[in-house]
Design a protein with these regions (language model features):
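Mixed-charge, low-complexity intrinsically disordered regions
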Residues: 1-5, 65-66, 105, 114, ...
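Compositionally biased, charged N-terminal/linker segments
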Residues: 1-39, 123, 131-133
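A contiguous binding-surface segment within folded domains or other stable secondary-structure elements
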Residues: 37-39, 55, 60
Length: 133
């Protein structure tokens, strides 16, 4: 899962970029950066609107694996490149995720400030179904 404030970068902006994708940069937390490093080309990621909305709004696909973040002067952190895959027909709110006991283990709930986090396959299926894609 990748998190962004929608007033900074939203699923609608991601959609407009199209198939060329964008660089997902600016991650300055080591745990989040390590999660970026684990991603493989073709991996799907939920796109979460943080702070404003607090909801999963869509899905993006990794098109380029971890490389040195061009915005990091010290070259310690990495970025990836993602492209828009699909928008959820119904956004999945943090409130609804918290209500589902099968999702209580997610980093989204346990480590709410983490900007990049894994989602296991079972949880992915539950959330995907909630979004009625």
């Amino acid at each position: 899962m990748l998190k962004s404030e929608p007033n900074v970068w939203s699923i609608d902006q991601q959609k407009k970029v199209g198939s060329k994708g964008i660089t997902w940069d600016g991650v300055r937390n080591y745990q989040a950066a390590n999660n970026l490093k684990k991603m493989k080309k073709g991996d799907l990621c939920f796109f979460y609107h943080s702070n404003i909305g607090r909801e999963i709004a869509g899905i993006v696909m990794v098109v380029k694996t971890a490389f040195i973040d061009p915005t990091d002067r010290d070259q310690k952190f990495v970025a990836i490149k993602v492209k828009f895959k699909e928008q959820l027909k119904k956004v999945v709110s943090l409130e609804n995720i918290k209500k589902n006991k099968a999702l209580n283990h997610l980093s989204l709930i346990k480590q709410s400030r983490l900007s990049v986090m894994p989602v296991d396959f079972k949880s992915w299926k539950i959330i995907y179904k909630m979004g009625k894609v």
